[in-house]
Every structure is written in structure tokens, then in C-alpha cells.
């Protein structure tokens, strides 16, 4: 099981404040992780910001955006030898136009 926590920095306001874009990115990130998407939930805040969670058979992907700060706090958590969480992280970095990222990866033991 891999759990990658990451912060996307210096992202354009418009991408971070777009709920449809955020949902689309999570769907495609799940596919790139080789995971099975079970559900997707999101909320658009007023005046800005989006929170979204993709429920995966293998765990989850989440994002919480702060457009006014140019920042998104995210995680990709997958289990199974077939998954590639790094691919989802890279895709999210690219699709939110980040110019910097801080990340930390945890390998969670089963026992």
C-alpha cells in the first residue's frame, strides 16, 4: 500500500476553482493509477475552492484547493501490486499547472 501526500503550488486560480475540471482530473488520475473508480464526490465553495474525493476499490484520491493561495493539498492512497499512484500524482501536477510540489510517500505495511 502506498500513500502519497502532496501539495501543488503556484497553480492558476481558474484551474483550482473549477469543480468540473477537478472532477475530470480525479477520474483520469484514477485510471492512470490503474485503479477502479467506485464513486466521485465534490463540493464547490463560495467564494472559491473545491474539495473532491474519488473513492477507489483500492482506496482513494482527494484534493482540497485554495485558489486564492494558488495551492492544492492532495493525496493518492492505493493498495495492490497493480497500482501506480505516482502516475496519478504526476498527472494532477500537470493538469493543475503547478510549478512546484512538495510530497511525502508512505509505504503502509499490511501487518
Feature map (PLM): residue ranges:
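Polybasic/polar functional segments that serve as interface/processing modules
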Residues: 1-111
Amino acid at each position: 500500500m502506498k500513500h502519497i501526500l502532496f501539495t501543488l503550488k503556484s497553480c492558476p486560480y481558474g484551474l483550482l476553482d473549477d469543480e468540473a475540471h477537478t472532477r475530470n482530473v480525479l477520474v483520469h488520475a484514477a485510471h492512470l493509477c490503474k485503479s477502479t473508480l467506485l464513486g466521485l464526490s465534490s463540493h464547490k465553495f463560495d467564494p472559491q475552492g473545491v474539495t473532491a474525493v474519488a473513492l477507489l476499490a483500492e482506496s482513494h484520491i482527494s484534493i482540497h484547493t485554495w485558489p486564492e493561495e494558488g495551492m492544492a493539498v492532495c493525496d493518492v492512497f492505493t493498495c495492490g501490486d497493480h497500482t501506480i499512484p505516482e502516475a496519478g500524482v504526476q498527472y494532477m501536477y500537470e493538469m493543475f499547472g503547478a510549478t512546484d510540489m512538495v510530497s511525502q510517500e508512505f509505504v503502509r505495511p499490511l501487518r
